[in-house]
C-alpha cells in the first residue's frame, strides 16, 4: 500500500481489490477500495467505511447497484473490509464466535480488521477526519451499531441498513452525539430490532432519521436508498452540526 497514494491517478474511478498484512491474524487480508475521480491529495476527502453482510464479502458490498456511482457523484472514498471472514460479525457478538476452522477470537479479529483497514486508508489518503462515516448491511448493520458505540469519537454519522441489531440498546448512550440514518424494510424479520433501536434513539433525543420502507425486504432496501443515505451523510460532519458543504434534498418519506 505504500505506493498506492502515488498511483492514485491510475486508480481513480475504479474499485480496487487490495490486501494488507494482518499481523494479529498472521495472514494477508483482502479489502476493497473505491477512489473517486475527484480525489485530490491536496484536499481532504470524506470517507465511508462499508461493512458487508453475513456470507458476503468486501467486494460484494462494493458491487451493490449504485453504491460507487453515488460515491463518485458526491466525492467519497469508500473502503470495505473483510472483517476477517464472511461471518466475523465485526465484534458485535463478542470477541469469540469462532467455530470449526475459525480462530477462537473471531469476533476480536473481525473488529480489528475493520480498524486496521480504516487506519491504512487514513495513512494513505488525505481523509477529512471530520467526515468519516460508517455504514453496513445486515450483519454489517449490527457491526455499525457496535463499532459506532465502541469508537464514538471517529464517526461523523452512521448508516445501519436492515441491521442485525445487538440486543443491548444501551450502547446508544455512548454515541448520543452521532447522527444516524436507519433504513429498514417492513417485510424484513429484522424490523422489530430496528424499531427497538429507533425507539431508544428517540428516548435519548438523538439526531436520527428512520426510513421504514413499505413492502421492503431484507436485500432490496440495501441498494434502493443510496440517495437518502448519501444525502444524510452529506448533511453532517463530526461536529454534529448540519454541514454546509452540500445542501441535501430532503429524503422522501416512505
For each feature predicted by the language model, list its residue ranges.
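A domain-start/cap signature at the N-terminus of enzymes
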Residues: 2-47, 110, 116, 135, ...
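Serine-hydrolase catalytic machinery in alpha/beta-hydrolase-like enzymes
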Residues: 17-32, 42-126
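Alpha/beta-hydrolase fold active-site loops
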Residues: 43-46, 156, 178-179
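Primarily recognizes the serine-hydrolase "nucleophile elbow" in alpha/beta-hydrolase
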Residues: 63, 120-126, 130-177
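Short beta-strand/loop motif that positions the catalytic acidic residue
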Residues: 181-184
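Histidine-bearing beta->alpha loop at or near hydrolase active sites
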Residues: 213-219
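Post-His helix in hydrolase/transferase enzymes
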Residues: 221-231
Amino acid at each position: 500500500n505504500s505506493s498506492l497514494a502515488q498511483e492514485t491517478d491510475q486508480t481513480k474511478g475504479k474499485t480496487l481489490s487490495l490486501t494488507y498484512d494482518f499481523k494479529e491474524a498472521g495472514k494477508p487480508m483482502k479489502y476493497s477500495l473505491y477512489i473517486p475521480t475527484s480525489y485530490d491529495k491536496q484536499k481532504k476527502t470524506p470517507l465511508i467505511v462499508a461493512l458487508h453482510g453475513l456470507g458476503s464479502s468486501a467486494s460484494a458490498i462494493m458491487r451493490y447497484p449504485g453504491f460507487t456511482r453515488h460515491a463518485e457523484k458526491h466525492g467519497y472514498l469508500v473502503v470495505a473490509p473483510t472483517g476477517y471472514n464472511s461471518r466475523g460479525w465485526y465484534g458485535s457478538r463478542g470477541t469469540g464466535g469462532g467455530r470449526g476452522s475459525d480462530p477462537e477470537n473471531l469476533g476480536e479479529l473481525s473488529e480489528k480488521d475493520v480498524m486496521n483497514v480504516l487506519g491504512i486508508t487514513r495513512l494513505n489518503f488525505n481523509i477529512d477526519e471530520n467526515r468519516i462515516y460508517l455504514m453496513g448491511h445486515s450483519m454489517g448493520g449490527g457491526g455499525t451499531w457496535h463499532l459506532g458505540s465502541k469508537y464514538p469519537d471517529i464517526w461523523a454519522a452512521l448508516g445501519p441498513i436492515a441491521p442485525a441489531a445487538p440486543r443491548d440498546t444501551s450502547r446508544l448512550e455512548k454515541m448520543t452525539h452521532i447522527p444516524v440514518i436507519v433504513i429498514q424494510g417492513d417485510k424484513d424479520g429484522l424490523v422489530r430490532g430496528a424499531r427497538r433501536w429507533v425507539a431508544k434513539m428517540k428516548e435519548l433525543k438523538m439526531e436520527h432519521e428512520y426510513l421504514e420502507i413499505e413492502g421492503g425486504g431484507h436485500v432490496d432496501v440495501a441498494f434502493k436508498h443510496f440517495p437518502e443515505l448519501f444525502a444524510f451523510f452529506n448533511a453532517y460532519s463530526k461536529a454534529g452540526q448540519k454541514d454546509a458543504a452540500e445542501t441535501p434534498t430532503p429524503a422522501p418519506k416512505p
